């Protein structure tokens, strides 16, 4: 039915739309806040603003029939201006769930408020234990590693980086480890992002994609070594705002609280960063081997998702345990071994310093940096290893002075000259063949 002046909406005079009045009425009908140009409802961030454009189109299509695309774009921009809000608080005392708000003291309310992240799972304290999920994990991981996974997945429910860890799940392939990512997607919804850890480090726009995200999953980790690790290390331990860039937008400062969960066939390594800080931020769990002749269940994920309310309670249990332990994860002996193996395989200087027949640690001895490096290159040659730089070897020793009971000095006497080296270590002369 054609509209007449008597049926025109208040914001339309027959020729023009009163944008202020339209936006006020639209926001009364669809409450929203605009933070840094992005719209939020009580259900969290609106990822697809096309939904809002469609609602605007429905409102105006009764009175206008041409130029709709441009008008919708202009009205959306006006709505954002009128809905302006400073950044929403990062709340670590509660979890916004599909049916209300769960508080970390164990209380729950059905009330909803504006938030950065609203999970897509409901809080149901009477949900049955997730038997299929627990069976799946028992077939995937060693029993002592399951509490670590439970704590990490619980850690991903809160917008905090106090745990200062990323989790790597390593296997030979085909074990089903990536099912965990799909289950987390069902709990977190749009608060989870799937991308590559390599992209996070190398693409300057990728960090902005992690804003307002609780979890980033890399379900097929690239095995090539990272050329840099600055951003990854900063994000894992993020405690203050960092620079964000979006295409066509002036860079700005924002705080990230995203956690990294990576699945792959090998560990995350760096091309140049062999520091303890890089490895200290990682938890490495290895999966059980895939049983020979096992028939994979194509409906496994569907079965797991039917238990998502119970899985959420299981994750909450891990979160409460983690907080009770002051954000210190339960790390099994096997997981610690995994980390040491990764460190040694990516930094052969560690193996050299623990070897015999090339160097000897003695309190009353000394060796020049050159002599130590020559011993190291002999070790590399004997073990078919590619040698690192002389600076890298000296740096490794200097960073671990207390561990090896050595002391860096520039007062080692060699052939009447004073050179750089270390006290407390000597190079062993090679035996003649």
For the regions a protein language model found, what residue spans apply to each?
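Conserved nucleotide-sensing/catalytic segment adjacent to the nucleotide-binding pocket
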Residues: 206-249
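Intein modules and their embedded homing endonuclease domains
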Residues: 1-119, 388
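P-loop NTPase catalytic core of nucleic-acid-dependent motor ATPases
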Residues: 27-51, 95-214, 283-285, 312-315, ...
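Replication-associated primase and helicase/ATPase modules
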Residues: 1-30, 40, 45-46, 125-139, ...
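Structural recognition of the conserved hydrophobic beta-strand(s) that form the central parallel beta-sheet
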Residues: 216-218, 258-265
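Positively charged interface segments
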Residues: 188-190, 195-204, 226-229, 243-251, ...
């Amino acid at each position: 039915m054609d509209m007449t002046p008597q049926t025109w909406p208040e914001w339309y005079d027959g020729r023009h739309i009163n944008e202020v009045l339209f936006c006020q009425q639209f926001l009364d009908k669809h409450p929203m806040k605009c933070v840094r140009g992005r719209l939020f409802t009580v259900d969290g961030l609106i990822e697809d603003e096309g939904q809002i454009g469609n609602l605007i189109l429905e409102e105006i299509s009764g009175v206008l029939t041409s130029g709709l695309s441009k008008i919708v774009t202009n009205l959306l921009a006006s709505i954002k201006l009128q809905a302006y809000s400073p950044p929403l608080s990062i709340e670590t005392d509660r979890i916004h769930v599909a049916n209300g708000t769960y508080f970390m003291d164990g209380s729950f309310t059905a009330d909803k408020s504006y938030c950065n992240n609203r999970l897509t799972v409901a809080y149901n304290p009477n949900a049955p234990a997730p038997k299929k999920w627990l069976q799946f994990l028992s077939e995937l991981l060693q029993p002592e590693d399951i509490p670590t996974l439970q704590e990490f997945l619980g850690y991903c429910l809160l917008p905090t980086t106090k745990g200062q860890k990323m989790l790597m799940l390593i296997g030979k392939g085909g074990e089903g480890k990536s099912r965990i990512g799909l289950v987390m997607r069902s709990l977190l919804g749009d608060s989870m992002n799937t991308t590559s850890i390599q992209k996070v480090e190398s693409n300057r726009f990728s960090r902005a994609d992690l804003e307002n995200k609780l979890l980033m999953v890399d379900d097929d980790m690239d095995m090539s070594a990272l050329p840099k690790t600055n951003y990854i290390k900063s994000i894992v331990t993020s405690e203050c705002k960092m620079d964000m860039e979006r295409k066509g937008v002036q860079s700005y400062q924002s705080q990230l609280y995203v956690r990294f969960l990576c699945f792959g066939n090998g560990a995350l390594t760096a091309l140049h960063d062999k520091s303890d800080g890089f490895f200290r931020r990682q938890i490495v769990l290895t999966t059980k081997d895939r049983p020979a002749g096992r028939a994979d269940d194509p409906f496994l994920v569907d079965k797991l998702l039917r238990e998502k309310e119970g899985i959420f309670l299981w994750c909450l249990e891990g979160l409460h345990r983690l907080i009770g332990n002051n954000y210190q994860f339960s790390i099994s002996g096997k997981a610690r071994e995994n980390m040491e193996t990764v460190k040694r395989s990516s930094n052969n200087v560690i193996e050299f310093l623990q070897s015999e027949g090339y160097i000897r640690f003695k309190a009353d001895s000394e060796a020049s940096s050159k002599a130590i490096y020559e011993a190291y290159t002999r070790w590399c040659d004997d073990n078919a290893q590619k040698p690192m730089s002389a600076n890298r070897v000296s740096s490794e020793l200097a960073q671990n002075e207390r561990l090896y009971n050595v002391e860096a000095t520039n007062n080692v006497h060699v052939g009447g000259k004073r050179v750089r080296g270390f006290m407390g270590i000597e190079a062993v002369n090679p035996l003649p063949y």
